[in-house]
Amino acid sequence: MKKLYSFLAGIVAIILVLWGIATHLDSKINSRDSQKLVIYNWGDYIDPELLERFTEETGIQVQYETFDSNEAMYTKIKQGGTTYDIAIPSEYMINKMKDEDLLVPLDYSKIEGLENIGPEFLNQSFDKGNKFSIPYFWGTLGIVYNETMVEEAPEHWDDLWKPEYKNSIMLFDGAREVLGLGLNSFGYSLNSKDTQQLEETVDKLYKLTPNIKAIVADEMKGYMIQNNAAIGVTFSGEVSQMLEKNENLRYVVPTEASNLWFDNMVIPKTVKNQDAAYAFINFMLKPENALKNAEYVGYSTPNLPAKELLPEEKKEDKAFYPDAETMKHLEVYEKFDHKWTGKYSDLFLQFKMYRK
């Protein structure tokens, strides 16, 4: 009997040793996973040195994956089967994702540095109270022009209809953008759901067609940089890259009204490492890191202490940091339901067909 007890005791000891080894290995694996952060962001939308600095300061390794459109990002997160701890979508997509329960509500007890974000960039209609997102970059829709190809700077939307701009204007290929500039030229909201206002706008846009050289998306950069068009309607973020390559280009935000856009940090429901996600948010809220990122990417930072550290000519540039009066007249694109999304798309298609 003693031999049997000894044998059983030996078996139990072996099991305990094996269990201990397995637990240790599992702990090491989990520890290694807990020290990894997976970021899903636009391409070339962060200074790579910041990712290295984040790892040095926190010990957390970064896996950086990119998308080329909000829709591509949304589809991948919606389908599941992925692990993203941080994503950086635009404002209208944040609205959609929170409504579809794809985002984790933020725990502000874990966030440090929110006071660095300007109050004008918080509590926007797409995320009231910033329950799901923290501003990363922001910008405007405006007019980029080549000062050697125009006699007067086109500072207002109505200027685009001047006859001297025949076959000179590039428009961004988007229903909200084109109909929005038309609505704004009347002083209407770019989120208008007034049928009469929309009809007036389309009629006015028909009269713009002789001045339109092309309706494009990414191709606008090439046209403007290579002096192949005098004027373009596009986003400030795109313009910052154009200005670096063509010293004759200028950018203006029409003071009467225009679009205000945001790209914000969110934590998707695909998150595996929330602690690392909050560590990254806090890291990017530090002024020195927001400054480095703004200088690398060239976009406008919502971090006020970081903005104050920019070169004087940059932070005083009203093209990228409009004054308070201009900011009052800027609107974000509100989320439309299926009916109004379809309405705008149909009107935009009519406009493009008329142009042909």
How should each PLM-predicted stretch be described?
Residues 198-207, 245-269:
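Periplasmic-binding protein-like
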Residues 98-105, 127-131, 241-253, 315-318:
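Ligand-binding "clamshell"
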Residues 1-14, 21-23:
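N-terminal Sec-pathway targeting helices
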Residues 268-328:
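Mature extracytoplasmic/periplasmic domains
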Residues 93-96, 225-226, 231-248:
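A ligand-binding cleft/hinge motif common to bilobed small-molecule-binding domains
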Residues 83, 88-228:
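Extracytoplasmic ligand-binding site segments that recognize negatively charged/polar headgroups
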Residues 324-356:
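Conserved C-terminal helix/tail region of periplasmic/extracytoplasmic solute-binding proteins
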Residues 7, 19-96:
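Early extracytoplasmic/lumenal segment of secretory-pathway proteins
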